[in-house]
Structure formats: structure tokens, C-alpha cells
Regions:
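Short, conserved catalytic or adaptor-binding loops enriched in Gly and charged residues
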Residues: 66-72, 147, 202-204
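Short aromatic/basic micro-patch
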Residues: 27, 173-174, 259
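Conserved N-terminal catalytic core of the sugar/cofactor nucleotidyltransferase
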Residues: 2-5, 13-16, 26-27, 31-106, ...
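A structural signal for short hydrophobic beta-strand segments in well-ordered beta-sheet cores
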Residues: 25, 145-147
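Catalytic-core segments of class I nucleotidyltransferases/pyrophosphorylases
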Residues: 103, 120-121, 152-254
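Conserved donor-nucleotide/metal-binding helix-loop-beta segment in metal-dependent transferases, i.e.
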Residues: 113-141
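A short acidic, often aromatic-flanked loop/helix-cap motif at beta-alpha or helix-coil junctions
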Residues: 83-86, 138-139, 162, 219-220
Length: 261
């Protein structure tokens, strides 16, 4: 299992800050945002990781993370010339994956919860695709899943104006080794992008898509706006003060797992 952090995008809702820095490099309390998705992959026991970023930002990520050696990781980098959809990341990562299963996480998503790492680690031997669900009040900003009484996915809709389902799909996905080939077969959407929901539908059509609700007590933040960044930062500060434990700290995770001294 290898990991992909998609740290591209224009971050237009965070302008003017994103005119000088990728949003994934902006601070969430005491750490850059990208530390949090990187930590999630590490909690899933994934140590080979590809960071995908825009041409004018890739060097900054490399300056921050290096080759991963200090974290017990092997980190490499790939340029995404322009935002062309989340699913394109599986195409860009094809050489890196080299037939491996993969975990894809969006660089602006923060996950935190007791036992989350152990749960995610269970998907390292996945057959098909694994996505997750999170109950939200307003699903309109997200990809949304409809499930039946057996918790099987019956429909996937991108940013619906109205939806009876309140199950948002967070930016974390596990795929088998066919993901890159499936992504290359997708056609661009009306907005000219290779959509992640279309990739998930490819698995759904083959009865190979599974959805699991994130464990009770898990927090998820999609940090795309100033309010989102503030809310996520407030959460991190509160949790660290309450528990005395660091949230989203790659070095601490590496030490706990014995990857570094």
C-alpha cells in the first residue's frame, strides 16, 4: 500500500493568501495543513508517499518534507500542471504506484479520532475501493452518497442542491491496483475535470465499492475557507490542551511507531 497526498488546486476561496503559498502550506494552529493528511496516512501504516502539487509550489513542499527520511518515510513528488480533477492524481501516480494498492487523501482534509489509525490500517489489503461517510447538516458543498438499509451505496452525487441523504464523502479513499487504469478510462466532466465520483462509480458498477461511516467520535475538517481553517485550528488547539497529546504531528507518529529514534 502506497499513499498519495493531493496538494494541488488553486485555493481561490483562501485568496489572497494562496497567491503566495499553497493552501496546504497555510497554518492550522501550530502546523502546516499538509501535516494532517500526511499524519493520517502514517497512522494507516503507509510509509511510501507521493505528494502532488502545482509547479510553482512543489519545491516548497520538498523544502518542508524533504525525502521523508527524518520521519521514517520515503516521500517523492509529482507536478500537476493544472487542476484537472481529483481522479487525475491516480494517473499522475501510476509510475509511483507500480501496480500497488493506494490510499489517496486530499491535502486540505484533517481527520482525528481515537482508534482511527487502526481502522484505516485494515484497508491496506483492499479489493475494490473503500470510501467513507460522514453525517453533515448541509451536504451541498460535498460529494454525497445514498445508501440502502444494508449500508450499500446506491447513488453518488456531486454537490447536490438538494439531497435527502446527509452522508458526505470525505477526501480519503483506498483503492486496489486497478485505480490508475480505471482513471485513464474516465471522460472529463462538464467542468473539464476527471471526477473522483466517476472513479468511484466505476467501482460501484462492478460491485466493488464499499462505504463505511467514519468511527464515532472522529472529527473531519475540509479546510477550504478561512472559517474552515479557523475551526480546524481551534479544534487542534483544544484537543492538544485537553489531552496533552499532539494532533497531526508526523514526527511524533514516527517516534511512536518506532520508525525513527
Amino acid at each position: 500500500m502506497k499513499g498519495i497526498v493531493l496538494a494541488g488546486g488553486l485555493g481561490s476561496r483562501l485568496s489572497p493568501l494562496t497567491k503566495v503559498a499553497s493552501k496546504q502550506l497555510l497554518p492550522v494552529y501550530d502546523k502546516p495543513l499538509v501535516y494532517y493528511p500526511l499524519s493520517t496516512l502514517m497512522l494507516a501504516n503507509i510509509r511510501e508517499i507521493l505528494v502532488i502539487a502545482a509547479p510553482n509550489q512543489i519545491e516548497r513542499f520538498s523544502d518542508l518534507l524533504g525525502n521523508g527520511e527524518e520521519l521514517g518515510l520515503c516521500i517523492s513528488y509529482k507536478v500537476q500542471m493544472k487542476p484537472a480533477g481529483i481522479a487525475e492524481s491516480l494517473i499522475l501516480a501510476e509510475e509511483f504506484l507500480d501496480g500497488s494498492k493506494s490510499a489517496l487523501i486530499l491535502g486540505d482534509n484533517l481527520f482525528h479520532g481515537s482508534g482511527l489509525g487502526r481502522r484505516l490500517e485494515a484497508f491496506n489489503e483492499i479489493e475494490g475501493a473503500q470510501t467513507f461517510g460522514y453525517h453533515v447538516q448541509d451536504p451541498s458543498p460535498y460529494g454525497v452518497a445514498t445508501v440502502n438499509d444494508d449500508n450499500m451505496v446506491t447513488a453518488l452525487v456531486e454537490k447536490p442542491k438538494y439531497s435527502e441523504s446527509k452522508i458526505a464523502i470525505p477526501g480519503l479513499y483506498f483503492f486496489d491496483e486497478t485505480a490508475s487504469c480505471r482513471a485513464k478510462e474516465l471522460k472529463p466532466s462538464k467542468r473539464g475535470e476527471l471526477e473522483i465520483l466517476d472513479l468511484l462509480r466505476s467501482y460501484l458498477d462492478d460491485l466493488l465499492l464499499n462505504l463505511e461511516m467514519l468511527p464515532r467520535g472522529t472529527a473531519w475538517f475540509d479546510s477550504g475557507t478561512f472559517d474552515d481553517l479557523h475551526e480546524a485550528g481551534t479544534y487542534v488547539k483544544l484537543m492538544q490542551e485537553r489531552t496533552g497529546e499532539r494532533v497531526g504531528d508526523p514526527l511524533e507518529i514516527a517516534k511512536i511507531r518506532g520508525w525513527v529514534n
